Amino acid sequence: MAAAVTIPGPRIGALQSSGLTLLLSLAAHCSGPQAKVLSPGGLDASGANLWASANCSLLQGFWCQPASQLPRDQLSALIQRLALLQVPLQAWQLSCLANLASRCGLQDDFTLHPPNLLLFYNLSQVREADCRAFIRRAAQGDVELLSHLPDQRVALWRAAVACLVGAGLRLSASDQQLLGALVCDMDASSIGAADPHMLENLRRCPRLTAAQRIALNSLLAGGKTSLGPPGSWTLEGLQALGPLATYISPHLWAQVQEAVGLGFFRSVVASCQVGRLGQREARCFVTSFLESKTKPVSSRPRLSTGNITAATLRDDLFLVHYDCAELESCLDGCILRTNLDTLLQHLLPTECQHVVKAKLAQIYPQGLPEDQLRLITSLVYLYSRTEIGQWSITSQDTVMALLASDVALENQTEAVLQKFLEHNGTVSGALLLAIGGTRLCWMSPHQIQTIHPQELRLAGALDLSSCPQSRKDVLYTKAHETFGSSGTLAAYYRLMRPYLGGSPGGAQPPSPVPPGGAPVEELRHLAHANISMDIDTFTSLNPLELQSLDVGNVTALLGHNVGDLQKARSHPTVRAWLRSLNSSTLGQLGLDASPTSPTGPAHGTRGPPSTTHQVLHLVHTSGLPTNDAQASTSGSLWAPLGYLPLAMALPCSLLCLLHWGTCILVSVDSVASGWLGSQGSGAGKTEVLDSAGRPLGLTGQL
């Protein structure tokens, strides 16, 4: 019988099975205050059918520690339910779930698992006969989830290409399409030389680098895609491009038929207004499109022959007809006052936003009234602390509206909240949920201290990854005060997890790193609590505190997630900890001191191609390290943990854990006869070609 833990919320009776323990834990620890707590009375917890009625909102609260107690059939049912409902789990949930699935031997059922989960799987366990099916499904996932696992992202690319190329060196057009979202890591030269049908995959990319955008425009300009040459593009064809159309250059827009371009402009404005297209992408398009219209290539007459009226502002093509200079000279203050919301629905360029701000200052010299403040979300970033000091903010709704923008408001957040607090406002859990963890990062220490503990508890798990170190210190102290009496260490960890970090996730920590986040004493306590910390949380810990943890502490802290150290060894936090260890200790882990070392402790005679001359590269996205933080070039993903010195140093219970986790810690060289070993010796030079015989590259060294 699983032991019940004390959790916030309604009192729960004795738990009858580990499956029910998990279900109730999920309900109690969902990220939002609306999480549902289910009664055990109406559920049959004896089998896998327990998960048949679990809904999406409940499953979003998935937590690995109680899931590790599930029998194999219930864990399998849970994973399949997650896939069926397309539950959007976060990286920290997926990484530990992948390790649980691997430990229970469930990876062979990958066709029934969520594509995002496959990104985290141990690739050496995928059978050669299944590799194409595995890559096809994994390529449907979001590779940005691997931002904290740079080496796993590298390994996934190498595995995919090794599988698709096989014994040959040519990557066919169909193979390129099979890469799915993985093509988001292709370098510019590869995109420019890729099969035109590659556009279908590039649509999956959340963003493209500047070089990739240039290559995309080169591909489109060639006229060999399904759209044809720019002069023959249609509205339907542009809409089929999806977000890729927002990267089209002004030079290409100037070649598009005017009626088609204007029709697409209208559709972008409409999509943005209803939330189908993000503000950032839409503004990128508008800027490019309007730039093309400043050149004398269009025969359209200028329509700005008189003052701007309310009817003019309702036209989706308003920005095409009026530039920012004409906006300043033709917009009357009275029209602006009564039609401010309509005007700001347009994706105004920065210059035009400054024009509107200046006109509002003329209309309201003593500061904007509160009813108007709720309309200027897109302009808030332009206001100084002094200007915000003139505002009167009495409503929580006004605060939510002002801080709802997706732009950085480092200087505005504190000022807006201060005006609200001056009118006896309070920072509630609902407000924290509405403005998100990013805004919490920019509150002053005093404002953070005014948050009532219960409100912080109601806010749930906020994303604090972008917080500066000084705020993380304050937030950790506040959260520790709030959750310090949560009962067991496991319950405490669930609530404290977002606040344990000491440096922004995925970024190179400053040197020296200011003290903050969870101190080493707390990390040691957590290591003995069987929490199995996920690798995302681990990489966000203060690197200076980690230096005081030995191999035993870290192994116990990560539990069944210890294998993820290899997947994240190039992450700055992990790399710094590895460098603090001596060579003999590293040998116990099967790792060398430097992730960029050309040699490693576990080489086989066969394996993936040598990366010294490898033409496959990875794009350095925001989540990937650069320069000295590149991934391992040793040709070995991992070495087994079954070393005698480590066995002698660890307790029996931990050895059992590592024994079950050994399948995660297998060198790629050990499967040389499989799909990762089909490339021959790594001693030579190998080039993978596309369908036309050109080298296929990926930016960054593998």
Curated annotation (Swiss-Prot):
Principal location class: membrane
Species assigned in the record: Homo sapiens
Membrane topology qualifier: Single-pass type I membrane protein
Protein name: Mesothelin-like protein
Keyword set includes Ribonucleoprotein: no
Phylogenetic classification of the source organism: Eukaryota, Metazoa, Chordata, Craniata, Vertebrata
GO biological process, one term: cell-matrix adhesion
Gene Ontology cellular component terms for the protein in this record: cell surface; membrane
Annotated InterPro entries: Mesothelin (IPR010335), Stereocilin-rel (IPR026664)
Residue ranges, Extracellular side: 36-638
Name of the encoding gene: MSLNL
Record family assignment: Belongs to the mesothelin family.
Signal peptide per UniProt: 1-35
Region (Disordered): 588-611
